[in-house]
């Protein structure tokens, strides 16, 4: 079976040792999270009793929008999560030395079923914007020591339209009815 593969690469002017902590805090929802969380909410969840910011292979769940991922590996160079749910695949980062800087590669690979291809066509513009925005925010954090509060990268009309459709579809889902009070 063929796979859907999407790759983004950015060279940053900092060595791996300085990039690594920023990758570790992605999808944490905190102020050191480089994901464009001011536009698309993200989160991280660990088992009860574990440090909420820990990265525990096989246990840590991360996500954004309707997407959930389980951490497979993080060794300080390769950060990889598996897609949770009906779509098989993974995404992750690979850090490589590049002179006095670091090359950051973000890759997504998904099973190429018909439904996956159709779904990917809808979300690819949003995904591409989010990865490039994350890279922008990472570079800002490396320069200043702080992740910007607002994501400055403009969103293409196609990505904005797709994000609006995704948000509208989510808001139109039927809400669960509250259970009836006792005595009814």
Give the location of each predicted region.
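Short, low-complexity, polar/charged sequence segments that are solvent-exposed and flexible
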Residues: 27-31, 90, 99-100, 123-128
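Hydrophobic ligand-binding cavity/cleft-lining segments
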Residues: 1-52, 160-184
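Short acidic, gly/pro-rich beta-turn/loop elements at beta-sheet edges
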Residues: 20, 31, 91-93, 114-116
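Hydrophobic-ligand binding "helix-grip"
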Residues: 57-105, 109-113, 168-184
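A conserved amphipathic terminal alpha-helix motif
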Residues: 110-177
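Hydrophobic pocket/interface hotspot
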Residues: 19-29, 71, 79, 104-106, ...
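Glycine-rich loops and low-complexity Gly/Arg-rich segments
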Residues: 32-37, 95-97, 106-108, 128-133
């Amino acid at each position: 079976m063929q796979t859907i593969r999407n790759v983004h690469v950015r060279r940053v002017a900092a060595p791996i040792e300085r990039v690594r902590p920023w990758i570790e805090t992605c999808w944490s929802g905190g102020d050191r999270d480089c994901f464009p969380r001011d536009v698309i909410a993200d989160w991280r969840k660990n088992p009860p009793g574990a440090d909420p910011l820990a990265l525990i292979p096989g246990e840590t769940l991360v996500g954004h929008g309707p997407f959930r991922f389980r951490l497979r590996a993080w060794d300080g160079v390769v950060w990889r999560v598996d897609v949770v749910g009906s779509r098989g695949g993974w995404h992750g980062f690979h850090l490589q030395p590049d002179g006095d800087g670091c090359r950051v590669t973000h890759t997504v690979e998904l099973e190429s079923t018909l439904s996956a291809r159709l779904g990917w066509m809808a979300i690819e513009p949003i995904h591409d914007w989010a990865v490039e925005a994350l890279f922008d925010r990472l570079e800002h954090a490396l320069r200043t020591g702080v992740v910007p509060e607002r994501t400055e990268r403009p969103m293409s009309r196609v990505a904005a339209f797709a994000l609006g459709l995704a948000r509208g579809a989510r808001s139109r889902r039927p809400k669960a009815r509250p259970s009836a009070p006792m005595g009814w």
